[in-house]
Amino acid sequence: MSKKNIFIIGSGFSSLSAACYLAKNGYKVTVLEKNSSLGGRARQLKKQGFTFDMGPSWYWMPDVFEKFFSDFNRRRSDYFELKKLNPAYKVFFGNNDTISIEDSMEKIKKTFEKEEAGSSVVLESFINEAKSNYELAVKKMLYEMPGISPIELVNSQTIRKVFSFITNIRKEVRKKFKSHRLRLILEFPVLFLGAKSSNTPGFYNFMNFADFGLGTWQPKNGFFDLVKGMIKLGKSLGVNYKTNMSVDSIKLKGNIVKGININGKFFSCDLIISGADYAHTESLLPKIYRQYSQKYWGKKTWAPSSLLFYVGFDTKIPKVEHHNLFFDTNFDDHAQDIYDEPKWPSDPLFYANFTSKTFTKTAPDGYENGFFLIPIATNLKDTNEIRDHY
């Protein structure tokens, strides 16, 4: 019996992961990437001696990656080195007004207590609840539930936590902490989920456990180490990877996939998995097979996009760390410009990353590599003049 032939669209982390599991289970797997290099948004840029992560830069939830490699009787350390950052990150609230989050709960509790008397006790209780939510979200929902029906989410454990699904992160944080600085630090992790803290259920405080409880890590050569590790594992399992393969459309006969069209050429397959955005994937299907209309997608609130800058400095940059959050402007005003009234932000918050602070080889000697990110709404007018302004 011949192996079923599966095409996977895109080469981001979900695609690279799926490819490995499918190949392990005996399928013939080919990953198709539209760009000239693999990794999706986690590609790497090298130029004039500088190395930049082009997308993801926060290595959180290390246990998830350890489990991934262990599922194939491998160890993460077989593929790349990992270092825990201290401080994990530094938050700027204004000139000479900063808070650094260090690498253990005991140190973080001292930082909180210094900022707000009594907050360390409250924080410990908050993080313990966040840990409980993390255990449920990752070990139960992620690893054990097949994700076929919403009914799976209704069980004795989730019922006991029903209030955390009704309330929101902002409400819970502001009920427990008075310091504006501490509130911002505790609300920021849910930005990784693409939503405002006021619109995110309190259950998602498990991101705070990922932050404070598990810590912030960094692969030696950047996030692309993880991409290379997953590809190396995939190749050992028989996965094929093809770049410069932009899928034009998916061909079906009845309700059965027959293959895909790429640059005017047809390639047959038995199954297709898409790691691309849902809306884009639907646009590849004939209209009669699409579940949602363009009008439907037009009414949806999209997760933020971002304006990115990759900057090579010919000097060392003082007073910054590996990860830096600049919260020196109004958080809510910027969020409104992203979600409520989409427009280019007038006074944006931003994030700055300098991997050369941890691994000097990512920049020439005496130099610094800077990655700068401004969260913005999607589908904004984009011109060189606007980019120059920022």
Please annotate each region the language model reported.
Residues D248-P364:
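Mid-domain catalytic core of redox enzymes
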